[in-house]
Amino acid sequence: MKIIFTEDVRGKGRRGEIKELPDGYANFLIKQNKAKQANAQAMSQLKGQKRAEARKEAEELEEAKKFKELLESGERVVEMKAKAGTDGRLFGSITSKQISQELEKQYGMKIDKRKMELREPIRTMGYVNVPVKLHNEVTAKIRVHISEK
């Protein structure tokens, strides 16, 4: 029997996948609401869902690209002040959370701190490029300037 998975079933199929399974197992999955029979109506509904998902994904990608342009346009530099020693090393460090808060304060742009790909907190003064993963395919760079208080 041909079925369409409505949920992921480990070892058998993923949500939205169409597969041919033995009748007994297919009926079991249908009763569990993990699959439905692949008739013409269900197939067209699945195609519609896939088109909607593709459209939504394209919109998210476009939005991420626009946000990247907005972040990198002009000379946007996040200015931060911190206490530092004589050799230019900071007392403490600058984290992605602080950068996110400062970006929102200065430019009104909200970025989740988890999207910033700082390998380790910033401990030196000067300019630093911080990569931000906005989407699977889109990565922007925020320029951060750390100066002494």
From Swiss-Prot:
Keywords: Ribonucleoprotein, Ribosomal protein, RNA-binding, rRNA-binding. Transmembrane segments: none annotated. GO terms for biological process: translation. GO terms for molecular function: rRNA binding; structural constituent of ribosome. Disulfide bonds: none annotated. It holds the Pfam family Ribosomal_L9_C. One of its GO terms (cellular component) is ribosome. Binds to the 23S rRNA. Belongs to the bacterial ribosomal protein bL9 family. HAMAP family: Ribosomal_bL9. This is Large ribosomal subunit protein bL9. It comes from Ligilactobacillus salivarius (strain UCC118). The gene is rplI.
